[in-house]
Amino acid sequence: MKVCFSNWFWRRPVAFALVGVVALVILSLIPLRATVARSALDADVVTGVARVIDGDTLDVAGERVRLEGIDAPEMAQSCGRNFFGTWKCGVVAANRLAELVRGHAVTCESRGYDKYGRMLGICFVDGHDINAEMVREGLAWAFVRYSQTYVREEAQARAARAGIWQGEAAPAWEYRAHRWASAEQGAPNGCAIKGNITAHGRIYHMPWSAWYASVKIEPEKGERWFCSEAQAIAAGWRPVISQ
């Protein structure tokens, strides 16, 4: 007796094989997707030796990091003492930050990026939050315009009259606004950022830079004025480094 099977029967192994192939492809993609997710997460953390730019900015493993949630005195800024006189709070803040990171690996966790392309980071040395330490020692304000993270540390510093809280001190953001308003009056078209060329390369100076007053712009040498920090960076200039 001749037994006949339908064509559907013979197609079933092929169908099952195709299903198996698809399943294997899907399974193979799962670890790939997990790897991509981990890589994206790893990109939000940088670790390495740090170089201090100023009291609230570091270079870590080639990444420019603005310490998130704090605002340190500018390099040219002075603050009032307990009873009389002033002290160079901007220089002291930068030097203290250098002490905190010197000889250590620094790990910074990203909280995003600012308009200049700098990572906004919370940075740690041996597990200790150095952003918090700068505020706690009275060497930076809690930058409450953008973050409430370090309000408690600022209250502690204020109560102890530590650092900037021992006398009168204009918050760094007010100091910058005042210096910019003053500098733009004498700058071409109100563009107050000085683009200087030195043996160390093309460097720009903000009106609150410690060397701003002494820098003379010579256009015939290729030096120039900038209207914004973003413009200076886009043109290939870098900020002056404190250390």
Language-model features, listed with the residues they occupy:
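Compositionally biased regions
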Residues: N7-W8, L29, A40, A199
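Electropositive
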Residues: R33-F143, V151
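Short, basic/low-complexity N-terminal boundary segments at the transition from targeting/disordered tails
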Residues: I26-S39, R176-A181
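Mature, structured domains enriched in cysteine- and short glycine motifs
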Residues: A140-Q148, Q156-Q243
